[in-house]
Amino acid sequence: MVQQVPENISFPAEEEKILEFWSKHNCFQECLKQSKLRPKFTFYDGPPFATGLPHYGHILAGTIKDIVTRYAHQSGFHVDRRFGWDCHGLPVEYEIDKTLGIKGPEDVAKMGIAEYNKQCRAIVMRYSAEWKSTVTRLGRWIDFDNDYKTLYPQFMESVWWVFKQLYDKGLVYRGVKVMPFSTACGTPLSNFESNQNYKDVQDPSVFVTFPLEEDENTSLVAWTTTPWTLPSNLALCVNPEIQYVKIKDVARGKLFILTEARLSALYKQESDYEILERFPGASLKGKKYKPLFDYFIKCKENGAFTVLVDHYVKDEEGTGVVHQAPYFGADDHRVCMDFNIIQKDSVPVCPVDASGCFTEEVTHFVGQYVKDADKNIIRMLKEQGRLLAAGTFTHSYPFCWRSDTPLIYKSVPSWFVRVEPMVDQLLKNNDLCYWVPEFVREKRFGNWLKEARDWAISRNRYWGTPIPLWVSEDLEEVVCIGSVAELEELSGTKISDLHRESIDHLTIPSRCGKAPLRRVSEVFDCWFESGSMPYAQVHYPFESKREFEDAFPADFIAEGIDQTRGWFYTLLVLATALFGQPPFKNVIVNGLILASDGQKMSKRKKNYPDPVSIIDKYGADALRLYLINSPVVRAENLRFKEEGVRDVLKDVLLPWYNAYRFFIQNVFRLHKEEEVKFLYNEHTVRESPNITDRWVLSFMQSLLGFFETEMAAYRLYTVVPRLVKFVDILTNWYVRMNRRRLKGESGVEDCVMALETLFSVLLSLCRLMAPYTPFLTELMYQNLKLLIDPASLRDKDTLSIHYLMLPRVREELIDKKTENAVSRMQSVIELGRVIRDRKTIPIKYPLKEIVVIHQDPEALEDIRSLEKYIIEELNVRKVTLSTDKNKYGIRLRAEPDHMVLGKRLKGAFKAVMMAIKRLSNEELERFQKSGSIVVEGHELHEEDIRLMYTFDQATGGTAQFEAHSDAQALVLLDVTPDQSMVDEGMAREVINRIQKLRKKCNLVPTDEITVYYNAKSEGRYLNNVIESHTDFIFATIKAPLKPYPVPTSDNILIQEQTQLKGSELEITLTKGSCVPGPACAYVNLNICANGTEQGGVLLLENPKGDNQLNLVKLKTVVTSVFGVKNAKLSVFHGETEIQNQTDLLSLSGRTLCVTAGASPSPISSPSTLLCQYLNLQLLNAEPQECLTGTVGTLLLENPLGQNGLTHQGLVHEAAKVFGLRSRRLRLFLNETQTQEITEDIPMKTLNMKTVYVSVLPTTADG
């Protein structure tokens, strides 16, 4: 049985219930079972570390993945969704080092690798429960039970296989390179890792002198921001083609050499120095200089402490003289190698250990952390007279992505994968991938690939997949292992785990007769593992070989833009190297989520709300929709604002929920009042003649087509705004314009058609929105599905909305002409609303006229066809349509598009702009028709000029109008006040107050109430308004409206006093309807005879319980009251003809059709008595003339709108009802007989009231 929908909803609480429902029915796994035989859609999930809690970046990427994979399932695919965990590498080790106070390799050696890795393993899944809880709570369907972890032996074995493939292809080598080095983690990083975390920092800025051996009074001046590298200086480098100068420092009396372009870096005024000589840098080549320190003086034997030349030196900063520390700078290393200052087999001049501290060679600073040693080195240079100037320099500098500490550049031996020879193939494969947004492929990722460098894949660490190379001591003999079986065979040992503690001790016999081969000490960079994820997660090629190859490359992946230098890159490098093809076909790249102030989100700064608290407060659907409906899905940044999530709930989810609630309310009303059970069957729904039904159905089908196209193109950022717009269309337009139809005010048949339309649209919208808002759509669907005719389901499994396939576009329902017509109507209404807002005239107050001016007659015809909606929505009496601008003083005005024309016309723009503004109305009309115009010699088109209407209020007697326009239409609204309209506005205010009280009591429309009122105003104004608008108020509130007092027997629901335009109004709602309808049984009549059609009412008894009609009497009364002469009448209820034996009282409240011919066509049946009426209550006399009732009913009109009752007629008819024609009567509005009904009381104010009949005594009675 369909459930009533509460007015108030806690979205988070309802989502928790949906989670229980999914869990109880194992919906996700069932979903996978159902789709097992469908075509596969392959999705790779990038593995996060579980050593930290999920943040908004994870939530965003997870939401994108969930939306696309849900969509793929609903599009007819089978989608395996396995969660993955990155378990190795620096993030884990760094946490352990901090916890255990480990400073370097010596501490690990003392502990032992086995114990160290045991500690790492223990925290790998530290936050896995929180991850699972948050991901599940967000509504993401992903398989945690069948996850993959990079620490699984099967995963690690596949990583070995990947590496061996590369090794066998000659893509692996060992080299010594200057690399980014994390002193906090004690390991080198790859170039793409070092590019992930740049910060602006202040470093020392020092100018140091290097006296020439040939002339110690002349010094080269070098500049550096890393004083700690100066103890390792082996050379200086200049640019051979730049002009250098020898100058005399006036103050110091010394001679210095530097580039002429950088003199300003040292001297503020030219008078501070004298240029003695100019020469190219090439002339400095080979000159010897005095070293700063003697730590590596032996290197002088190999040509150290010499001036070298290279074009990498620039004169844009520094002095044009660069100090060379070849083991701490990549360019330094290359140049010194070129000039044989160092050789491949040289002992490295690298006096810095893995912790970033000076080793014993640097005796003055041994044990000092290099950055801390800067100030001490500067002090020593000053003492030695080698410091020319010192300050600070702000620049962007790389930090370790894990420890957030500054990196240094340091030469270390590492294992590399050759990437540089692959660049062309990488670019080619990148072009085969579809990127959303496109610019990421071309710009960010493409540019990165063009500059790709060989990848350092080894880390001098412990917790990771060991590099499977067994080597001789001299590294001449190398065996690369590609599987567990291979290692077991070569080592003769059974293996159960592949971590260092399990295999480091294993040796392999040498084929060359050398000592047994031992494994190299390094482990893989964890990015190598995640890049191997497509193969390793399925243990390829050891298992699932066919399945993997059939499903590779992946159909879809998604991550943040930072992964262009991370996971996206490593995936592409490995897939290109292994298979020569890209690893994925489609990729969505999201931007970064920042704090509301634009800064990076920081736990330390606490500058963002906790994601769990946001979900608990607003729900996951609101958070999901907020993130997806933002620039972040276009790879732009998003400043996260809590109020944005709140607004999604308020502006999208609540209105959508209320439309659904309104639908359910009216399904209940239909069943209760009309005894019609609503069941939807899309195969038997009749085409509605109502234009708004056709419009909203067409709009939905157009949306479906757009949804299919854009989702297939992975453009979520275009889909969500359209879905959100449709919620607005549905709630603020369709439901609003059809409230009366949906509430049954236009008859049962039309009500059912409107409900069918709304049901169809609600269900389709739920199916489209299901991937985006999985909870709310499930909540609605669980109730809506109970209204689907089982005969139409065709054995589909309908337990969850997420089992349903997406609806297909029904082209036959698309009606673009109707969509355009309604769009034009909406524009008119919106323009009218702007005018009302501008003049602060509430919509409750009716206005006389709206004039719509449009140059397109077809547009005006469209607007004419929807005129009644304009009248209702803008509350106007009359709509006037015209193409005559001049009649109303309307002229055209032009505004240039500054951006478009300014860019195109440049210097000529100003003159063209002025000329555009001077164009006459006639010229602009010609431009409006032709679409082009020549201004100042430039041909301009529609995209260059914006036309607007202007309104001259003083022209042509139009002073009563206010105007507003858009590009196509201008609307004039007559805002002149009119008393009858003001009165109606007051009546609407009364209705508004009553409905608000209803809402306060959480009443639904089918709850029966009585409304009592007490109005206090000057001259009884408010009383008069209420009395004269009683019918209007009742038609809206569907409840009896009575003046005070409130009977003591009534059950009061709520009572409230309010102010209304200076009047006091007290309203009381009581439970139950004090006037449930006519006291006597009745039927509504629809009479079709003699070529005319009439409506009216017949009372089947009067007074109650007496004077009952049979069929013969009914026909006689019809002939008399409705003037039907000379016709043989037949009476029908629906399609069934009434027979003589029919009990007419059983048909009370129904509508009968009286015809002089065949069975009538179906008619709508009003839910209340068709004519106005009042009830009679006899107070103090027994009925006469054998009549037994004391309660009766009088019709104030019959037929409908005819034969209105007068006061005299009321007295006469009351006496007639009770057989008291010979008695004098007095009539009262209350039982206490204090409010007598006199001739000056309008009869229409008595509608639906009870009139109390008092019989005056006769002489005989006395």
From Swiss-Prot:
Family as reported in the entry's similarity comment: Belongs to the class-I aminoacyl-tRNA synthetase family.
Cellular component annotations (GO), alphabetically ordered: aminoacyl-tRNA synthetase multienzyme complex; cytoplasm; cytosol; nucleoplasm
Identification of the protein by name: Isoleucine--tRNA ligase, cytoplasmic
Source lineage: Eukaryota, Metazoa, Chordata, Craniata, Vertebrata
Motif ('HIGH' region): 48-58
UniProt subcellular location: Cytoplasm; Cytoplasm, Cytosol
The keyword Cell membrane appears for this protein: no
Chain's role: Catalyzes the specific attachment of an amino acid to its cognate tRNA in a 2 step reaction: the amino acid (AA) is first activated by ATP to form AA-AMP and then transferred to the acceptor end of the tRNA.
GO terms classed as biological process: isoleucyl-tRNA aminoacylation
Residue window of motif 'KMSKS' region: 600-604
Modified residues (Phosphoserine): 1049
One Pfam family here: Ubiquitin_IARS1
One of the record's GO molecular function terms: GTPase binding
EC number(s) on file: 6.1.1.5
Record-linked PROSITE patterns: AA_TRNA_LIGASE_I (PS00178)
Reaction(s) the record says it catalyses: tRNA(Ile) + L-isoleucine + ATP = L-isoleucyl-tRNA(Ile) + AMP + diphosphate
Positions where N-acetylmethionine occurs in the chain: 1
Top-level lineage group: Eukaryota
Modification Phosphothreonine, positions: 1058
Quaternary structure annotation from Swiss-Prot or TrEMBL: Part of a multisubunit complex that groups tRNA ligases for Arg (RARS1), Asp (DARS1), Gln (QARS1), Ile (IARS1), Leu (LARS1), Lys (KARS1), Met (MARS1) the bifunctional ligase for Glu and Pro (EPRS1) and the auxiliary subunits AIMP1/p43, AIMP2/p38 and EEF1E1/p18.
This protein's UniProt keywords: Acetylation, Aminoacyl-tRNA synthetase, ATP-binding, Cytoplasm, Ligase, Nucleotide-binding, Phosphoprotein, Protein biosynthesis
Residues binding ATP: 603
